[in-house]
A protein has these predicted regions:
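Short, hydrophobic beta-strand segments that form beta-sheet elements in well-ordered domains
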Residues: 35-37, 83-84
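Short, glycine/serine-rich, charged loops/turns that create anion-binding
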Residues: 11, 41, 88
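Two-component/phosphorelay signaling modules centered on CheY-like receiver
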Residues: 11-35
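CheY-like receiver
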Residues: 45, 51-96
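Helix N-cap/capping motif at the beta->alpha junctions
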Residues: 36-42, 65
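Conserved acidic carboxylate
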Residues: 8
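Non-catalytic signal-transmission and effector/linker regions of two-component phosphorelay proteins
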Residues: 1-3
Length: 96
């Protein structure tokens, strides 16, 4: 089973992402274990390389998603990180 971390400070967006994941599971007859985190700091405190995919908001209180991703990459070069944002100016930076 693939493990997904949803790191998003907005409850509404977290709920939407869970809905999309459940829909994908049904359409593809697969299963994911999705775990929500409200802050990047909370996620970083427990992350030890045990997620396959990280859905990461960029604008959050405390450590932002870009800085969190840099810290994650120091521990885990293989995990898939997908940034979630509605701010276009972050689009290019997310690929660095």
């Amino acid at each position: 089973m693939n493990r997904i971390a949803i790191v998003e400070d907005d409850q509404g967006y977290r709920d939407t992402l869970f809905t999309y994941i459940k829909q994908y599971e049904q359409e593809r007859d697969t299963a994911f274990e999705a775990t929500p985190f409200e802050k990047a700091d909370d996620f970083l405190a427990v992350y030890n390389g045990d997620y396959d995919i990280i859905l990461m908001d960029i604008e959050m209180p405390g450590t932002n998603g870009m800085d969190a991703a840099e810290q994650i990459r120091k521990k885990d070069a293989q995990v898939v990180i997908m940034f979630i944002t509605n701010m276009a100016h972050y689009a290019i930076k997310g690929y660095e």
